[in-house]
Curated annotation (Swiss-Prot):
The keyword Transport applies. The active site is at residue 306. Pfam families: E1-E2_ATPase, Hydrolase. GO terms for molecular function: ATP binding; ATP hydrolysis activity; magnesium ion binding; P-type potassium transmembrane transporter activity. Gene3D superfamilies: Calcium-transporting ATPase, cytoplasmic domain N (3.40.1110.10), Calcium-transporting ATPase, cytoplasmic transduction domain A (2.70.150.10), HAD superfamily/HAD-like (3.40.50.1000). NCBIfam families: ATPase_P-type (TIGR01494), kdpB (TIGR01497). Part of the high-affinity ATP-driven potassium transport (or Kdp) system, which catalyzes the hydrolysis of ATP coupled with the electrogenic transport of potassium into the cytoplasm. This subunit is responsible for energy coupling to the transport system and for the release of the potassium ions to the cytoplasm. It is an enzyme of class 7 (translocase). It is a multi-pass membrane protein. This is Potassium-transporting ATPase ATP-binding subunit. Keywords: ATP-binding, Cell membrane, Ion transport, Magnesium, Membrane, Metal-binding, Nucleotide-binding, Phosphoprotein, Potassium, Potassium transport, Translocase, Transmembrane, Transmembrane helix, Transport.
Amino acid sequence: MMEKGIWKDALIQSTKKLSPKLQVKNPVMLLVYVGAILATSLYFLGFFGISDEKSGYTLAIALILWFTVLFANFAEAIAEGRGRAQADSLKMARKDVLARKLKHIDDKTDVIEVASNDLKKDDIVYVLANEQIPMDGEVIEGAASVDESAITGESAPVIRESGGDRSAVTGGTTLVSDWLVIRVTAVSGESFLDKMIAMVEGASRKKTPNEIALQILLVTLSIIFLAVSATLLPFTEFASKQAGSGSAISITNVIALLVCLAPTTIGALLSSIGIAGMSRLNQANVLAMSGRAIEAAGDVDVLLLDKTGTITLGNRKASEFIPVDGVTEQELADAAQLSSIADETAEGRSIVVLAKERFDIRGRDFAEMHAEFVPFTATTRMSGIDYQENTIRKGAADAVRTYVTANGGTYPQECDAIVSKVAGAGGTPLVVVRNNKVLGVIYLKDIVKNGVKERFLDLRKMGIKTIMITGDNPMTAAAIAAEAGVDDFLAEATPEAKLELIREYQREGHLVAMTGDGTNDAPALAQADVAVAMNTGTQAAKEAGNMVDLDSSPTKLIDIVRIGKQLLMTRGALTTFSVANDLAKYFAIIPVLFYGIFPQLEALNLMGLTSPTSAILSAIIYNALIIIFLIPLSLKGVKYREMPAGKLLSRNMLIYGLGGLVAPFIAIKLIDMLLTVLGIV
């Protein structure tokens, strides 16, 4: 249930939206708006004896038309109100605070206190525990726990640190521990929080291409019905004279008939469907930079999914040291630990822990060793340490083979056998080499998440192809892909390989979605049709994507696709229902309206409507009430089911197409009976 305040605010907003400036934005409802004004004018003209229109009947038509416009405004106001309520909670996190601006990055005592709104890009700020981060930025020094609950709703603090893919921080979040030095990446008004508020309020929402195309269709239909209705006045006048019976249709009835036949149902709900779709995405803690991105998600037929965190649990754990002949397990463990000391990944830490547990290998004096750590990069796919004329590297088998060969060493065939065995079991092998001599393999164990196979099966039913992206060798990738049930995989993936894979599928006419969090993902994110950047990721990744997942959960991509498809389905279902409604109302009203001139048409009055007046009133009352009844469906969305597109279309055509034809006949007859019983007609 929505809060009482949202309903109250929506009622107020629906009256404010009666302004002509706002009504012009919806051409279909503008037709009803103008009709209401004309009917009201005719009532007053009849009241003062200037017109022959029946004053009581004309007043009833005018009031119903005004309520139709108000109901359409109410649908849009409710959708906007839900977004506004979410925006209000975000605004509480956005407040001007004093920031410590560093004059020199090396001197944390020499600071200038400035208001956060006055900070500029590339300013360096120093933030301590229990202080609010003043503006969006990149951590350039330090590591700390950050409370991001104001934005994500997740109460557990997250780690933010310099380097790597967890360096981005958001203004309005709070430091829980330690300290950070941050380089500002956005100015006031352009921050991530500002963009979120603008999106959920709908201030920056633009109509999507599909919405524009549908609105053009609805306007075209409305113009056709307007032309048809306009000709009824001279036609019925001529026909009544020729037939010698009946009378010309009144202007009030022409207005009412036009409103009944125009696609007012979908015209009234179209805006609220789009806003509600954006709101559902926001409730899933995903910020879309445009409505176009949500629609693209609904049309996606290829998903590129990172193995780690999406398909597997994410934290691979070192489970075994497997040395080659002539090398002891302890010797391999010692070298593996040294190469992983500076590795802050979960895998790196697990290697250090396993070496401690197995052989009690403890910390070293790296200053005395004159050690220099070599970080992992996507290009080399290795990390390690250089110390006292010793060089240790660990990494993917093919990367280590290239490294050893390039330096004049020999890569043993025995190592290939170990790598194949580990990969065949679904593990990840990391080869360790010291001074160009291969020592053995670290066995990292991957665990596939529960339930992913079933989810991929559902996606396959929907006609979506799933591709696992991993840096693992082909054998490991194949084993995990088979266990998880994905359609294909890309092994030993580099940024260039991801980019080329996306382009290849796009050339074949597919729409591609992917997730990413690192700077190296930025080119592929920029190329993908739906690009979901992780909130924990780098600024470059966020700027390249067209969506940001505040929870930084790679599995969210599947939910985003479902929300996108639900949006398109809801719009299609209600459009089908609206058009079917118009057809039914046409066959319900026209025979009754004209059987005074053409008595033969009485045979087509299948519902036995009492009179033309009753038929018009019943139809126009139904036309207004159906908008109110469909508001919950437009906000919640049509329930999405994992089934082939053809079956889904047939199902929805049966429910909303046939339902749209039957509902008006039943409802109009019931309203007609009620009006007759009450003596209104």
